[in-house]
Amino acid sequence: MANRLKEKYTNEVIPALTEKFNYTSVMAVPKVEKIVLNMGVGDAVSNAKNLEKAAAELALISGQKPLITKAKKSIAGFRLREGVAIGAKVTLRGERMYEFLDKLVSVSLPRVRDFHGVPTKSFDGRGNYTLGVKEQLIFPEISFDDVDKVRGLDIVIVTTANTDEESRELLKALGMPFAK
């Protein structure tokens, strides 16, 4: 069964963007390439259990096993040594990516307290969008009772768009609730 958001992209978004930006080929229309979820766990330096919990939560949210990230260099101020595990990340592509984006837009973001839309200034100039989530509780897979500590995560949506405007239109057409 094809994903609801992927069908919407094929049937509605491609024709709309082709008309707006006058693309000559269907392949020129921007699409979502991948979504990267990153959870930096700074307190994992002193307590490795925190990193395990964070990785387990990230696995629940994304549906795949996270990659443990390690410190690239030592920083004495943070009591950090090179090679120490300090975070977890997941790269979603294909079906899982569309499922996650659909869930993020329709279920998770509306659960954020005092939500007025995601900021429009978080584009990087190359058509990629970054979103910070302050608490992992907005995702339906995370049970309130199982959470030992509120952790945030970064969500990076990488698109094939060349400009921020094209990327914004793509995400808006896919249902991303941008702030007015």
Curated annotation (Swiss-Prot):
Gene Ontology MF terms in the entry: rRNA binding; structural constituent of ribosome; tRNA binding
Record keywords: Ribonucleoprotein, Ribosomal protein, RNA-binding, rRNA-binding, tRNA-binding
Gene Ontology cellular component list: ribonucleoprotein complex; ribosome
GO biological process terms held by the UniProt record: translation
Pfam families in UniProt: Ribosomal_L5, Ribosomal_L5_C
InterPro entries, alphabetized: Ribosomal_uL5 (IPR002132), Ribosomal_uL5_bac-type (IPR020930), Ribosomal_uL5_C (IPR031309), Ribosomal_uL5_CS (IPR020929), Ribosomal_uL5_dom_sf (IPR022803), Ribosomal_uL5_N (IPR031310)
Keyword Ribonucleoprotein attached: yes
HAMAP family: Ribosomal_uL5_B (MF_01333_B)
Matches recorded under NCBIfam families: PRK00010.1
Similarity field: Belongs to the universal ribosomal protein uL5 family.
Function: This is one of the proteins that bind and probably mediate the attachment of the 5S RNA into the large ribosomal subunit, where it forms part of the central protuberance. In the 70S ribosome it contacts protein S13 of the 30S subunit (bridge B1b), connecting the 2 subunits; this bridge is implicated in subunit movement. Contacts the P site tRNA; the 5S rRNA and some of its associated proteins might help stabilize positioning of ribosome-bound tRNAs.
Subunit structure: Part of the 50S ribosomal subunit; part of the 5S rRNA/L5/L18/L25 subcomplex. Contacts the 5S rRNA and the P site tRNA. Forms a bridge to the 30S subunit in the 70S ribosome.
Protein name per UniProt: Large ribosomal subunit protein uL5
